[in-house]
Amino acid sequence: MIKRLPDDFIFGGATAAYQAEGATTIDGKGAVAWDRYLKDNYWYTAEPASDFYHQYPVDLALAEQFGINGIRISIAWSRIFPEGFGEVNAKGVAFYHSLFAECHKHHVEPFVTLHHFDTPEALHSRGDFLNRENIDHFVAYAAYCFKEFPEVTYWTTFNEIGPIGDGQYLVGKFPPGISYDLAKVFQSHHNMMLAHARALVHYKEQAYPGEIGIVHALPTKYPLDPKKPGDVLAAELDDIIHNKFILDATYLGQYSEKTMAGVKHILAENGGSLDLRPEDFELLQAAKDLNDFLGINYYMSDWLRAFDGETEIIHNGKGEKGGSKYQIKGVGQRVFDVDVPRTDWDWMIYPQGLYDQIMRIKADYPGYKKIYITENGLGYKDTCIDGRIDDDARIDYIKQHLAVIADAISTGANVKGYFIWSLMDVFSWSNGYDKRYGLFYVDFETQKRYPKKSAYWYQQLAATKTISM
């Protein structure tokens, strides 16, 4: 069976500043919370990462050679404003001008994100987005970038508001490492959506000629047994935490009655309250129809069952399959032993979940305009033997997910592009350097790049726009 993607479809690769650039302390870059947090809590740091700060001409030349016509890049906020606000770092500004020029030189369209998990330490230490002053600082930073970088046509404000709150305040694997505080999770989500809305309104008021949107991670949630009301409720509540709360803010400008009922139930079980103000919803209402596109990051789905017990989450960071546990008081318990393939990190491989999520957006949020799949890929323990990397599992993963994207398009969804995570191997926030995603293998000691088998497959796909199943 042959499936075809549109002629104007973007075949992209994704990166992120902190995961790729390295160079964390040079040319005036300010600190981020991750710098110390990784040293204190993990077995790796963000040095050298992929040394994208110096190697970007190599990576962009490879992108062009292999038919990749789009790249996701994030600007490191602390490279522009080392303290998060105030004095501008001219060397940081010059770096991004050079980077974007190199993108255009190689006919690779940059899709630029303003915040990818890396709030400057000077602001993070004051509460990050739990502190409403951070909204003001983010909007000022965004406004500066919109004006300074007219060579950028496609902007996204935030990458994955959901996992930021989840990582910082629920699982506790991101700085500041707070666990099981659901009120902080929701408040962080809400305040970041306010920052998005203000930046979005500013961009449109200035009548910039480009497009702007937001990237959400949207793992699809299913009841373990659809016939059991408790399992159905568990899936709905977990969906509210990770998906529906932020989607409502993005496209409804408010939280639906069902969403708020779920939030109130979760907080009644776990404690805490939210600061939601009337003027917040005036802002969300003003922004809800201004998003030019939605970026969907999709890697996995989850199956949930009813659970009556205390919260316990164990993050599988070392790729030891079966090491995960996820159960939240008053919400539910994720079940990993289902008839679905999973990675060594217990991520469930389920392409149908991406199709279902796209169609959910189309049905529930018809004002979405268009979608890009801004991250999707397979984390794998790749091995390089004499410069050859056979990653057939990754090819199969990408193929299956692109096939359901083609199905969604044929069903009427407006999906305009796909960005594999990641363009080249980068370091993983909570898994280090062993979990590789790239089309190009990076020898982190020499920084030499090697195209994987998947890179050659992706090159052919970009040329033909066809998927052979």
From Swiss-Prot:
GO molecular-function term, one example from the UniProt record: 6-phospho-beta-galactosidase activity
Alphabetized InterPro entries for the sequence: 6P-beta-galactosidase, Glyco_hydro_1, Glyco_hydro_1_AS, Glyco_hydro_1_N_CS, Glycoside_hydrolase_SF
Residue stretches in coiled coil: none
Residues engaged in binding D-galactose 6-phosphate: Q19, H116, N159, E160, N297, S428, W429, K435, Y437
Keywords: Glycosidase, Hydrolase
A GO-annotated cellular component: cytosol
Name of the top EC class for this enzyme: hydrolase
EC code(s) of this entry: 3.2.1.85
Record family assignment: Belongs to the glycosyl hydrolase 1 family.
Name under which the protein is recorded: 6-phospho-beta-galactosidase
Chain's gene name: lacG
